[in-house]
Amino acid sequence: MYSGAGPALAPPAPPPPPIQGYAFKPPPRPDFGTSGRTIKLQANFFEMDIPKIDIYHYELDIKPEKCPRRVNREIVEHMVQHFKTQIFGDRKPVFDGRKNLYTAMPLPIGRDKVELEVTLPGEGKDRIFKVSIKWVSCVSLQALHDALSGRLPSVPFETIQALDVVMRHLPSMRYTPVGRSFFTASEGCSNPLGGGREVWFGFHQSVRPSLWKMMLNIDVSATAFYKAQPVIEFVCEVLDFKSIEEQQKPLTDSQRVKFTKEIKGLKVEITHCGQMKRKYRVCNVTRRPASHQTFPLQQESGQTVECTVAQYFKDRHKLVLRYPHLPCLQVGQEQKHTYLPLEVCNIVAGQRCIKKLTDNQTSTMIRATARSAPDRQEEISKLMRSASFNTDPYVREFGIMVKDEMTDVTGRVLQPPSILYGGRNKAIATPVQGVWDMRNKQFHTGIEIKVWAIACFAPQRQCTEVHLKSFTEQLRKISRDAGMPIQGQPCFCKYAQGADSVEPMFRHLKNTYAGLQLVVVILPGKTPVYAEVKRVGDTVLGMATQCVQMKNVQRTTPQTLSNLWLKINVKLGGVNNILLPQGRPPVFQQPVIFLGADVTHPPAGDGKKPSIAAVVGSMDAHPNRYCATVRVQQHRQEIIQDLAAMVRELLIQFYKSTRFKPTRIIFYRDGVSEGQFQQVLHHELLAIREACIKLEKDYQPGITFIVVQKRHHTRLFCTDKNERVGKSGNIPAGTTVDTKITHPTEFDFYLCSHAGIQGTSRPSHYHVLWDDNRFSSDELQILTYQLCHTYVRCTRSVSIPAPAYYAHLVAFRARYHLVDKEHDSAEGSHTSGQSNGRDHQALAKAVQVHQDTLRTMYFA
């Protein structure tokens, strides 16, 4: 079962005993890869020339605290000007907006703490701040040079932080910073997304250590902001009114709820006090209109009366409201009862939208931002010219120079694996540009379908019996060709309506038809029925379900039908295709389990929903079949809390499926940012070891722990136009880079395993945090690339290895398992646990998959 080609691997090094306080250190790069044909590339990294000087680090303490960074920057700017003669002289300090200030020459304050008073001219009255400055340390740029050339074991974090602050100081004052990016409203042309939102374009900038050099990573980026506009217009956009005039009566409850959801948390400024445009944060929307909403008003006589908002504005501001029938915004703190009519408020400019975009907004956003690779390359070059870092006075102060040209990199295009099919002819497919064809091929192991049912939740007048009959015929024909025959007609074919009818219908099916293998469910577009079908099928009754959109039943295409079959065969226990055994890397010579892990978090702005952790494990030698485990955990918790138990379950399942104990565990971990590497590695590596030791005292398989990252800003471009692929002119599938722009000492690489269809391809970044198995660069890169070809839903290589992709699907499916029946779909609805305060145990039970589903790839 586990025979393969090529030389045997070095035996895994026995893991050191797990010591709680021990800091695990990522392994050094073993070598550079050589496999594949070379390709000349350019990366959006710009070489930095750094002097070998010391930088002086000071800590600032600004009172009163809690000012936004923008205000802190103004305070420091005023401070440097005001105390120029006494302290700062001609120095140009840089500041991170919080506490850290850096200078190229020491300030004449020695080691003492200095207290200063700074006045900011404000609207109405000046604001006074107390600022203390204290010396922290000398940051040596010489040490950075030593680390980059390998003379020091690790790159000193504080030097990178200092350089980052230097490079970001001026852009932070010019633009709106968001994370590591800077944005600005487009001059002259707006890019509306609807619902009061618009696209802002900007750029990402970060300082990164690489082999021999520090690099500046620059990329174009875009994000959604709220449009600066009167709140009255915002209401119209959110509630789809052509103009506010069509709303002559108060808002209905559902309109008010929708409006509240959108405006809560946003900042508004008032327009009824002349130049004094005070800003407030919205905490709620009143149930009553301005004509009826009252508040306690203290009169001159000292007595308090209830006054309506409309009356108050008429008496106090001589303003007769035009829309007294509309509600008010409640602003500031809830207990303070400050109400503002909608018509005197504007949405403040420059507020980023952190709430989830609707499907329409997302597709508009993609259309507005997708750029072919050559276009993106040109835009980045333009950006560099306009940023002109070499004339930035702050960058020059520290003696830093940045090259204007992108970095030339030599990459390699790896050979794709051969894909083996089944049937009589055992056909072999060879991917070309990450794609292959299943025509005239049969599944490696097709499942025969004898008992199946159709449930149609689309209206009968739109999806007629003729449609259903023709769809069934087409499905049976393509299934025969694919080597997965459907015997006979469905045993049941009925129409149904609404999510409430799902469970009774499925119970009836399960009890009536012995050996029922599959229920095909037809849906009329986006509907809460989907979540309910998956909840009942996956967690309550343990039935295999396949949902199909009505439009794909009314008009069948070979493409949609074969996509359905790829999914159905796998859900029922079949194997679509496998990697050609003789082409696999040597790691397959002994039993090996591939694990994929991911944690998905609820959308920002939703403080109550849990995060979901999913881990999947391969269950055969191909590897093709996978088994899933899933848990709910604390909101926004990044580390997988119950990993030891999850891995233990998967190891037991692997043994049941194969009768082998894996001698190696290859763990692909998605969704971890660089700042969390150490923490995640420490906790999760120990958890995997604990899972092994709990199974058997001396069981110590070699563990390789690899973090997969897609959310980064590295982009690669072909230098030679003839190498560009497809309409978007991207790099070829299989392009790998492990030199020049990678980590100075650690084992990491970029691999673009998919063919980019729209926009510029984003290569995945792989960082090896632990490796008992002593992989060479070639072997790990080839293994990773081959695993990107084993994703069952399509006949193309995907952008990350199948196990990591499946973990993502499992976590995503668990979100649907948590959806309350009375609400709508997983995107927009409350998840159980918020609306009715379900405790952790109930949530944990809700995502637990039924015993019969557990061993299947229900998530495919």
Swiss-Prot record:
<dbReference type="GO" id="GO:0004521">
    <property type="term" value="F:RNA endonuclease activity"/>
</dbReference>
<dbReference type="InterPro" id="IPR036085">
    <property type="entry name" value="PAZ_dom_sf"/>
</dbReference>
<keyword id="KW-0539">Nucleus</keyword>
<feature type="region of interest" description="Disordered">
    <location>
        <begin position="1"/>
        <end position="30"/>
    </location>
</feature>
<dbReference type="GO" id="GO:0035278">
    <property type="term" value="P:miRNA-mediated gene silencing by inhibition of translation"/>
</dbReference>
<keyword id="KW-0255">Endonuclease</keyword>
<dbReference type="GO" id="GO:0046872">
    <property type="term" value="F:metal ion binding"/>
</dbReference>
<dbReference type="InterPro" id="IPR045246">
    <property type="entry name" value="Piwi_ago-like"/>
</dbReference>
<feature type="modified residue" description="Phosphoserine">
    <location>
        <position position="829"/>
    </location>
</feature>
<feature type="binding site">
    <location>
        <position position="598"/>
    </location>
    <ligand>
        <name>a divalent metal cation</name>
    </ligand>
</feature>
<dbReference type="GO" id="GO:0035194">
    <property type="term" value="P:regulatory ncRNA-mediated post-transcriptional gene silencing"/>
</dbReference>
<dbReference type="InterPro" id="IPR036397">
    <property type="entry name" value="RNaseH_sf"/>
</dbReference>
<dbReference type="Pfam" id="PF02170">
    <property type="entry name" value="PAZ"/>
</dbReference>
<dbReference type="GO" id="GO:0070578">
    <property type="term" value="C:RISC-loading complex"/>
</dbReference>
<dbReference type="InterPro" id="IPR032473">
    <property type="entry name" value="Argonaute_Mid_dom"/>
</dbReference>
<keyword id="KW-0687">Ribonucleoprotein</keyword>
<keyword id="KW-0378">Hydrolase</keyword>
<feature type="region of interest" description="Interaction with guide RNA">
    <location>
        <begin position="525"/>
        <end position="567"/>
    </location>
</feature>
<dbReference type="InterPro" id="IPR028602">
    <property type="entry name" value="AGO2"/>
</dbReference>
<dbReference type="Pfam" id="PF16486">
    <property type="entry name" value="ArgoN"/>
</dbReference>
<dbReference type="InterPro" id="IPR014811">
    <property type="entry name" value="ArgoL1"/>
</dbReference>
<feature type="modified residue" description="Phosphoserine">
    <location>
        <position position="825"/>
    </location>
</feature>
<feature type="region of interest" description="Interaction with GW182 family members">
    <location>
        <begin position="588"/>
        <end position="591"/>
    </location>
</feature>
<dbReference type="GO" id="GO:0035198">
    <property type="term" value="F:miRNA binding"/>
</dbReference>
<dbReference type="Pfam" id="PF08699">
    <property type="entry name" value="ArgoL1"/>
</dbReference>
<dbReference type="GO" id="GO:0003727">
    <property type="term" value="F:single-stranded RNA binding"/>
</dbReference>
<dbReference type="GO" id="GO:0000932">
    <property type="term" value="C:P-body"/>
</dbReference>
<dbReference type="InterPro" id="IPR012337">
    <property type="entry name" value="RNaseH-like_sf"/>
</dbReference>
<feature type="region of interest" description="Interaction with guide RNA">
    <location>
        <begin position="754"/>
        <end position="762"/>
    </location>
</feature>
<keyword id="KW-0943">RNA-mediated gene silencing</keyword>
<keyword id="KW-0804">Transcription</keyword>
<feature type="modified residue" description="Phosphoserine">
    <location>
        <position position="835"/>
    </location>
</feature>
<feature type="compositionally biased region" description="Pro residues">
    <location>
        <begin position="9"/>
        <end position="30"/>
    </location>
</feature>
<feature type="binding site">
    <location>
        <position position="670"/>
    </location>
    <ligand>
        <name>a divalent metal cation</name>
    </ligand>
</feature>
<feature type="region of interest" description="Interaction with guide RNA">
    <location>
        <begin position="791"/>
        <end position="813"/>
    </location>
</feature>
<keyword id="KW-0963">Cytoplasm</keyword>
<dbReference type="GO" id="GO:0098808">
    <property type="term" value="F:mRNA cap binding"/>
</dbReference>
<dbReference type="GO" id="GO:0045947">
    <property type="term" value="P:negative regulation of translational initiation"/>
</dbReference>
<dbReference type="GO" id="GO:0005634">
    <property type="term" value="C:nucleus"/>
</dbReference>
<feature type="region of interest" description="Interaction with guide RNA">
    <location>
        <begin position="710"/>
        <end position="711"/>
    </location>
</feature>
<dbReference type="GO" id="GO:0006355">
    <property type="term" value="P:regulation of DNA-templated transcription"/>
</dbReference>
<dbReference type="InterPro" id="IPR003100">
    <property type="entry name" value="PAZ_dom"/>
</dbReference>
